[in-house]
Amino acid sequence: MNEHGERDERHGDGERHGDGAAGTHGAAGARGEGGEGARDIAGLPTPAGRPDEATEAFLAHRSLLFTVAYELLGSAADAEDVLQETWLRWVGVDLAVVRDPRAYLVRMTTRQALNRLRTLRRRRESYVGPWLPEPLLTAPDVAEDVELAESVSMAMLLVLETLGPAERAVFVLRDVFGLEYGEIAEAVGKSQAAVRQIAHRARSHVAARRPRGAVSAAETRDALEAFRRAVETGDLQGLLDLLAPDVVLLTDGGGVVRAAQAPVVGAGRVAEVLGRIADTATLLPAQVNGRPALLLRLEGRLDTVVAVRLDEGLITGLYAVRNPEKLSRMQRETAVRR
């Protein structure tokens, strides 16, 4: 979906964020084999008898670690890379001195994610057009954990993008995953007093920017169904009734496919753009990032993932991810946990 409602063609090289292909990713995704001469799940030699213990501990918390990394980075491909780096460090740890593997692994993952986040921020400064998080196809039961579903939603991830790296890590670890201040202090390399101040500052920052009013999954689903009908039937007034006057449409093509290079602002302009795809688009419901969303298909192929932000019953944000390098996670469900 571009600003002119045209069908896209690939152009330019665009920025590549890594391989988010379906299935497990490198080291952190497969189970190793035990025994003498065994190799760890990265394919590197490890001492006899060691892989099973390390692997079991890692796999027990893998979905949690992925979710931590993803919420800090907004990129599944980069989150998988962080898990790879975490695994390689984990197999070098003396497990006999680790009292709490979960806390230890979360700290390791957070440190690796913060290192990568600083690099990603510089890369995103040169990103072609609006940058949006990489969407995840998630299971319906994610919505049952309301706080988790909100924290991985497209709208919340965009709010988290407005925090500094340390603020983002502290907020995610404290308010989403419920870590103690001492654990967070070790993860981010700051004192507990500093972490408490950062948490207060980050919480206020997020509260001022998060969606206004509690919105249930059912309300979002109903709004999206009305939105789908209006788009597919070309019902302009129906669209205008759903859109807030100051609604913002962001389209992420990453320089790989055509997309609006700047936000499209205002109900009239957004409805006009959406009206141009009525004859060619098929919109299907899906569960994306813990919330109801729509998949836009053209000629039978996935073209765009559409997520929304609702404030007080109206759509205030439309997030259309078109960059094909970000759509590979839509081929299978990704487990997110806390």
Please provide the spans of the model-predicted regions:
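Low-complexity, glycine/alanine/valine/leucine- and proline-rich hydrophobic stretches
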Residues: 267-338
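Short, well-structured alpha-helical segments
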Residues: 79-83, 240, 271
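A solvent-exposed, acidic/Ser-Thr-rich amphipathic alpha-helical stretch
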Residues: 245-283
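Compositionally biased, low-complexity flexible segments
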Residues: 18-35
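Short, well-ordered alpha-helical segments enriched in acidic and aromatic residues
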Residues: 234-250
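Amphipathic alpha-helical regulatory segments at dimerization interfaces
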Residues: 226-233, 242, 273-276
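Active-site-adjacent scaffolding segments
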Residues: 1-9, 19, 36-81, 85-224, ...
